[in-house]
Amino acid sequence: MKKNEQKVVFLDRDGVINKEVGYLHHIKDFKFIDGVFSACQYFQKNGYFIIIVTNQSGIARGYYQEEDFHVLTKWMVKEFSNNSIDILDVFFCPHGPESTCNCRKPNPGMLLDAKEKYNIDMNNSWMIGDKEADVGAANSAGINNTILVKTGHNIDESHSQAKFILKSIKETIGIIK
């Protein structure tokens, strides 16, 4: 690690932090996945900052407004705070799958923006997601420590580039050190 570089656990949102419900934008539909708070407390105790990186194509598709996303995000970050967890930042891509933007995973834009903003040591950071796009974005950004969790989308384990495939985020305790 270079001087003043931070190590980070990057988390996808839907399917990692909360149960996947498809275009989530109402607080009433948000259900935290069991073990997410204890895992995040563990990451912090081990010197990691936590950043959320999430594709939100529901904005581009017109299913909800960007303001709806911000209201839900503010509430979610407060819930983390109520559990003694500091979320350093939340990066999101509002574009649809057909977009040529660099921020939509599997492109690395959100991770690279975070690296620049917070001087992150990508070699000692981790990405936890529920889709191969999360792994692709991480690898393209120089993060080789990747975990896919089975609490979101189905994972083709035989073709995955993830370093670990686990049942849920709570199984990351002990793996991330």
Kindly label every feature range from the protein language model.
Residues 62-77, 101-113:
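Short, electropositive alpha-helical surface patch
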Residues 102-132:
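Conserved Lys-Pro-Asp/Glu-containing loop-to-beta segment of HAD-superfamily phosphomonoesterases
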Residues 17-34, 59-68, 83-85, 95-102:
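Metal-dependent phosphoesterase signature
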Residues 1-49:
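Active-site neighborhood of HAD-like aspartate-dependent phosphohydrolases
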Residues 86-89, 122-125, 145:
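Short acidic capping loops at alpha-helix termini that bridge into adjacent secondary structure
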Residues 36, 40-73, 86-96, 138:
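Substrate-recognition element of Asp-dependent hydrolases with the DxDx(T/V) motif
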Residues 127-164:
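Acidic, Mg2+-coordinating phosphoryl-transfer loop and its flanking beta/alpha structural elements
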Residues 163-171:
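Short acidic-hydrophobic, aromatic-tinged amphipathic segments that line or gate anion-handling sites
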